[in-house]
UniProtKB/Swiss-Prot annotation:
Annotated Basic and acidic residues bias: 1-15, 672-681
UniProt cross-references to SMART domains, sorted A to Z: AAA (SM00382)
Protein name, entry field: ATP-dependent translocase ABCB1
Annotated segments matching region Disordered: 1-26, 646-681
The protein's assembly and partners: Interacts with PSMB5.
Biased composition (Polar residues): 648-657
Residues annotated as domain ABC transmembrane type-1: 50-353, 707-996
Stretches in topological domain Extracellular: 67-112, 205-211, 313-326, 729-752, 850, 954-969
Function text: Translocates drugs and phospholipids across the membrane. Catalyzes the flop of phospholipids from the cytoplasmic to the exoplasmic leaflet of the apical membrane. Participates mainly to the flop of phosphatidylcholine, phosphatidylethanolamine, beta-D-glucosylceramides and sphingomyelins. Energy-dependent efflux pump responsible for decreased drug accumulation in multidrug-resistant cells.
Cytoplasmic topological segments: 1-43, 134-182, 233-290, 349-707, 774-828, 871-930, 992-1276
Phylogenetic lineage: Eukaryota, Metazoa, Chordata, Craniata, Vertebrata
Catalysed conversion reaction: ATP + H2O + xenobioticSide 1 = ADP + phosphate + xenobioticSide 2; ATP + H2O + phospholipidSide 1 = ADP + phosphate + phospholipidSide 2; a 1,2-diacyl-sn-glycero-3-phosphoethanolamine(in) + ATP + H2O = a 1,2-diacyl-sn-glycero-3-phosphoethanolamine(out) + ADP + phosphate + H(+); a 1,2-diacyl-sn-glycero-3-phosphocholine(out) + ATP + H2O = a 1,2-diacyl-sn-glycero-3-phosphocholine(in) + ADP + phosphate + H(+)
Species name: Mus musculus
E.C. number(s) listed in UniProt: 7.6.2.2, 7.6.2.1
UniProt keyword annotation of Membrane present: yes
Amino acid sequence: MELEEDLKGRADKNFSKMGKKSKKEKKEKKPAVSVLTMFRYAGWLDRLYMLVGTLAAIIHGVALPLMMLIFGDMTDSFASVGNVSKNSTNMSEADKRAMFAKLEEEMTTYAYYYTGIGAGVLIVAYIQVSFWCLAAGRQIHKIRQKFFHAIMNQEIGWFDVHDVGELNTRLTDDVSKINEGIGDKIGMFFQAMATFFGGFIIGFTRGWKLTLVILAISPVLGLSAGIWAKILSSFTDKELHAYAKAGAVAEEVLAAIRTVIAFGGQKKELERYNNNLEEAKRLGIKKAITANISMGAAFLLIYASYALAFWYGTSLVISKEYSIGQVLTVFFSVLIGAFSVGQASPNIEAFANARGAAYEVFKIIDNKPSIDSFSKSGHKPDNIQGNLEFKNIHFSYPSRKEVQILKGLNLKVKSGQTVALVGNSGCGKSTTVQLMQRLYDPLDGMVSIDGQDIRTINVRYLREIIGVVSQEPVLFATTIAENIRYGREDVTMDEIEKAVKEANAYDFIMKLPHQFDTLVGERGAQLSGGQKQRIAIARALVRNPKILLLDEATSALDTESEAVVQAALDKAREGRTTIVIAHRLSTVRNADVIAGFDGGVIVEQGNHDELMREKGIYFKLVMTQTAGNEIELGNEACKSKDEIDNLDMSSKDSGSSLIRRRSTRKSICGPHDQDRKLSTKEALDEDVPPASFWRILKLNSTEWPYFVVGIFCAIINGGLQPAFSVIFSKVVGVFTNGGPPETQRQNSNLFSLLFLILGIISFITFFLQGFTFGKAGEILTKRLRYMVFKSMLRQDVSWFDDPKNTTGALTTRLANDAAQVKGATGSRLAVIFQNIANLGTGIIISLIYGWQLTLLLLAIVPIIAIAGVVEMKMLSGQALKDKKELEGSGKIATEAIENFRTVVSLTREQKFETMYAQSLQIPYRNAMKKAHVFGITFSFTQAMMYFSYAACFRFGAYLVTQQLMTFENVLLVFSAIVFGAMAVGQVSSFAPDYAKATVSASHIIRIIEKTPEIDSYSTQGLKPNMLEGNVQFSGVVFNYPTRPSIPVLQGLSLEVKKGQTLALVGSSGCGKSTVVQLLERFYDPMAGSVFLDGKEIKQLNVQWLRAQLGIVSQEPILFDCSIAENIAYGDNSRVVSYEEIVRAAKEANIHQFIDSLPDKYNTRVGDKGTQLSGGQKQRIAIARALVRQPHILLLDEATSALDTESEKVVQEALDKAREGRTCIVIAHRLSTIQNADLIVVIQNGKVKEHGTHQQLLAQKGIYFSMVSVQAGAKRS
């Protein structure tokens, strides 16, 4: 099950390269660990458990063949009575009575034997199951911890080449596969093997001739079973592969749903999903055909072997070589032995799967990183001055060894100095910072602190003296205080408050309802960019680091936050050695040294003035920025600073910034939901009334011809079993009732022939039954998955905001619901019909032949059935509970793995390990409990079988002596009822599946029938031929549906004429991005209206409306496909030509970069575009928006993530793109919007000021103060 590989080899057919790779990997044999290595984590107690469990399993396995010995002797007793009474017609009543009394006495003894075996089984079956489960639970607990420790111990370079999603899968799926393979399944395997050997030994000792004849057909049976298993597992593999690819598409699409909706990509994504489903369906149908041909063939062979065995056996009895009891003992012993091999095969398969999974898991556990963050070795200097030096550093990333990043870097930083690194995107600035933390080691050269090579310093110690603030700060899904505590384990609340004040975050935190105990949400999604950044700064400050690394720490902030955060950083730098990376050069003017990077080396160094005189790289970058940046404050600039400070800055971070359902920037492309597979169980099991059986069948109604044929065959199959019982008892009756040898010979020939006919019928009916239901089931699964996905893509954005509908929850639902519905319709339905027919026919026949014994058996059967149901119930209940509890640990693991860089920089690996270990405690205790529960229920169901034999044959003997029944009829009733009951037991084991199916069906029906308020698929609404591009908001009131109590827009009115550029400014969280989302019609306003060319947008066709808009957001989401496909995604209504893609790339100034890549436009961008830098992603996103040729352009902070040079060219590209288009721009960097036709200042959800740059400066209001703050920062 190369699920991981599939997730990596993401979803699209056209990526033939990927396809080839996975095919090649498929062919190679999967590596597995040796049998003994599987148990490398077993302690002495586990070994004892396994040893005793194995002995118990062997004893349990021998019980069944032993019972057959008794059964044979018992048949002989009956036969002798039958023969005597037949042959001696003149027997006196007294003799008869004496004979029957002797028979009853013998039967009582046999009943005691049966009971004794049952009592033994009760004990050993419990030991067998519970001991193996205990041993497995204990080992898995260790493996989980070791594995998580190993992941936390790897170096960053290792993570670059391993897929994060894959590690999560390994941690959940692979470890549970090991669990499956090393627990009670091994006990069951030994039990089956003991039965096999026991059966054959008894067979050979009691009658070797007959054993050899039966064995002649066994290899054929075994071989066919083996081939069947092989074919089936290869189809299952391929089918899972196809489903995994479909799942990967769904996950990617749902994680980027806002991007998909904005660009109208629903149809394209549905097709992509459907192609993978089509493949899975095709394989599923093939699987159904092969599986059922083999199934039919197996039944044919089994019946043929019965025919042969009974024909030969009866010959031996007639020639007086064997007794009839001997024939039955040999026949059943060998048969049970042979079947036990078949029963062992799923256990062998589970063990083989476990070995394969263990190979991957142990490989990671054994992988020793070259940079070991847990290592105790290395120097820990008492006193660090903070003199840093990079000496002739050469470096390339492990994931792209061919691209050299640093080519001989030399740089010295003196203690207490601030050094700024400047240069273009991708020139190696961030790499330098990463080498300083020893996230990687250089290929050549040396990094040193105070003259000491950092490779000789203890890794953990080194990272603890460094504080890092990066461009996109990662917060963990816990409280604000906890997040800051990640900076330093033993920090006090006072220190946290002090750090927060220094980072200028205190005010906004105190305004939150729970203050420091406010949960920040997944990845900090509940806070705005500026708020997150300041918490990250506080987190770095509590470490009181000797060395501070600031990688673009203020780029994501709005003006006002930026000024205060910048002040906080300036304060933080005092007395510390600091390395700063900044695209915004105004923030690094006061650095002691500015180092200009170009092509992986430093080409110039000096302070601002020196470098300006040199007129090199730095000078160029500064000129580029200031050309657009000199904010004309005119004479106003000389206003005293105090006056600016006194201006109304009430817009600080008004509490409203908390609205961010997920920070406004993320809103266009919600972050990749990190709970991935770990969907909250509540989300999946919310209370929906289960759908009725008929409702489920209705979903499958178009396949009714298949069902008619299938049900007809199923009923015939059901009748075959009782027919077998009748023939079997007649064969035995031929001998127990006595009679001349010729008649016996004729009768036994006839009955043997009937066995063969049964086989031929079953071959045809089994194949047809399985195939028809299987095909109908596959068609249904595909149809449901497609309908559900289609319906999900139809929903509006507010539906995706609902915490119940995270990406993880939805992908899980897509994968599980359809499969579970199939569980209640497909082949399961066939088996239910078949088994009901089986028991029904069985009971009718039994009542005719012996109603007294039938009633006794019908009283016992429910007890066995109830025991079976209880066992199923307990196990499925436990499984649910397990899953729910492991979800908690899964969430911790996912968070740690996805944000591993942050965990490493903060040296918090051990903290996550402790949290993970704690979260495993409850599942571990449950596993221990479950071992006993499972052991008790299992042993009870097993032992009941022996007890019921005792009761049945003892009572049967009584009925025979009373001459109410013959032995032949006792056998008939017994086998008809017991086989029927076993069949019903099989049905009852489907009950949990059926229950799941009804819940899943109701989920599906609910989603399919849900029509959203804003329906992307609707054909209704106007589609004007002409669009000018006049936009008007009139008295718009809006709150996000997930936070109805927090007002966002409170009566907002604004207007932008065609071709104009409107700029929205305001502090974080004031509702700027919301304006863009309302225009895209992601949401509808609660009051007021939005107009386009004078028409209310609610009257326009949704798809048409979005096709007129092109959007570029701050953190663009790219899909895991080629650059060309990502750009072409801009217009999904047609096939975008290669020329257009190139033209758009040139306009967005990214063509040159793409052209320099080995695969050019076919280069894959990686999951969420991870293979590209921020600036490169942004430009591809701009090209994507331009391909649309939109009438209205929406730019939400489109340049904030870029370095100076990219920004300048991208800004030019955007200016060019704006020509003749209506444009709405959101920007924190005010210099980029000076030339806007209209600037609107939003505060608390209303327009506070509007006008041109000059008009607003003259008003000396909020805008003026924001500009002054930014200009002040520049001047300083």
